[in-house]
Amino acid sequence: MKTGRTRPLRVFDILVPPWPPTVPHRIKLPRGKTNWFEFYSAITRNWNKLKGLKNCWQIWKDVQEIIRRIRKYQGESTVMQGPGNNDGAHPYATMAGKLDSKLLQALKVMEFEYMTPVQHRVLTELPSWRSDCLVQAKTGTGKTLAFLLPTLHCLLQGHSAPPRGQVAILIITPTRELAQQIAKSCDQLTSQLARPLECHIAVGGTARASALARFMKGAPSILVATPGRLKDYLSEPSTAEKLSNIQTLILDEADTMLESGFLADVKRILQLIPPKSTGWQGMCFSATVPPKVKDVVSVVLKPGYTSISTIEKNETPTHERVPQYHVLIPSVADTFTTLASLLNLEIKNSSKIIVFGVTANMVALFAAAFSQGLTPLKVFEIHSRLSQSARTKTTALFKEAATGIMFASDVIGRGMDFPNVDLVIQVGLPSNGEQYVHRVGRTARAGNDGRAIILLTEAESFFMKVNRHLPIQPHPQTDAINAGASSCADAVTKAMYSIGEETKQRAYSSYIGFFAGSGLLKQVRLDKPGLVQLANELAIQGMGCPEPPPMDKKVVGKMGLKGVPGFNYATGNDLNGDRPARPRGRPGNKTRDVLSPGAGQGDRRGSVSKNRGGRRGGGRGGRGGRGGKPRAA
């Protein structure tokens, strides 16, 4: 079978998901188009402007005609739907008489005609669908259906089904978003049953009391949970009783889950559920099998388990084949202007971008700023400070979007699959090299191309030395990016002016907390007063704050920074409300000397270097002038 370009047409990701990763030559193009790339470029270049084009109707008809031809081609050829497709077709229809008819009916409704490689191998290579197995497969290759189909089939066929109201299938996954995805797929697969099976979710970030009440009152057959909340459930005897007859335990994204700090929780869960000797089935899905996974596998899977891998032994990992670059920011105050300049440059070639920040509140500030017209692309925002419903909605919208920028924390850094992300930007230090790699893994998925860029200050550049094994090169247009930052300063100043004080204060506080609690101070060659000074520079020169945002003394104490000079301690209602504050000066340009460790403590001439307010109250400190009594420590 001949195939064309390997890059999918993004517009079709919305119109006919899942789009095959190869574009066949035998499908004729609309009139006037000589090749697939030309057609692809015309559509993606003008997609957001279709309403204003005179030929809008003709382009739409072209798209609809291509859809018709693609569907016809899929029906005639041996192309397999889904990622990793080049081995020939394995239609779900071949499972008739083996897989429950209602599940096959649901697959038809879901328009899943062909199995992906991992689905086909699990359904055909397991000695029994009740067998223990370790399956190596990447995210986005159809793993969810690979474990749901055999386990749901066994449950529907009544193989050792527990009493009604007790959980038969327990699925543990590392993030709330993945849990939502799995539960949605489960509901779709059971939608054709006369009485659909109840699938419940137990995740953090949601109202625990109401979720637990629904779980206890309902008749859950399937529970999808994150480790922390599941351990919480199992700690209560009445809740644990509902999990006393599990038939199948599934660990999804096991390497991600165990390498990201959940090892202790998972081990505790394995102690709280019925022992392996009771006969429950174990299924472990993981892209890699590091030592931590092997430790858990020995408990979850019995000796002689089936091992399946859909990953080529010599396949280059994503983080090694994605072009990666770094841009060194002149100073932390230039963070926002440099990011604006970089995005202005990159959106010429990238239309779906994820930008990671170091904390949830910094991400919120990025999103607020760039929503003020700093980019022509639609801005999305997702982080742990948002409600679960807001995060779920954003996840769905960004998946469907053809273009856009999503500012994100690590709630989507691991495991989440967003189609056609062609650029990942990381602003600031990742916690470690592993976190960096997982973020890079959000691009170049399912055979697509992608790039990754990290923005760091000079002090943070040690990250490249510590992680020499990562192929991070200097960005070829670093000089142009830094030069363009100054031209973005006015726009950034205007954007920052429209953002409330509380949003900036939270970002400022979280920035300090990140470094104070991460053990990175020594590596960036900072002491505690230096950290506060750096954060003040970011706030005043970068965020446009008139003075360091107010901090609560209790919060400062919890950060281990009690007595450190440079803080502007809150009084009265300083931490209440979210009022806009006019910035002083321009981001990236020094405006005042309030950045020293003695910030806010003017001398006799009104400067800021001493411990007493000046007579005339110059700067921010004079007792008799506008500064009043000094508030800094």
Curated annotation (Swiss-Prot):
Source taxon at top rank: Eukaryota
Transit peptide extent on chain: 1-32
Binding locations of ATP: P83, G84, N85, N86, D87, G88, A89, H90
Domain notes: The Q motif is unique to and characteristic of the DEAD box family of RNA helicases and controls ATP binding and hydrolysis.
Localization, UniProt: Mitochondrion matrix
Name under which the protein is recorded: ATP-dependent RNA helicase mss116, mitochondrial
Ranges that cross the membrane: none
Region (Disordered): 567-633
Encoding gene per record: mss116
PROSITE patterns in the record: HELICASE_ATP_BIND_1, HELICASE_CTER, Q_MOTIF
Record domain Helicase C-terminal: where: 262-429
Keyword Flavoprotein appears in the UniProt entry: no
E.C. no: 3.6.4.13
Disulfide bonds: none
Pfam families, alphabetized: DEAD, Helicase_C
Chain ranges for the short sequence motif DEAD box as given in the UniProt record: 195-198
GO biological process assignments: mRNA processing; regulation of translation; RNA splicing
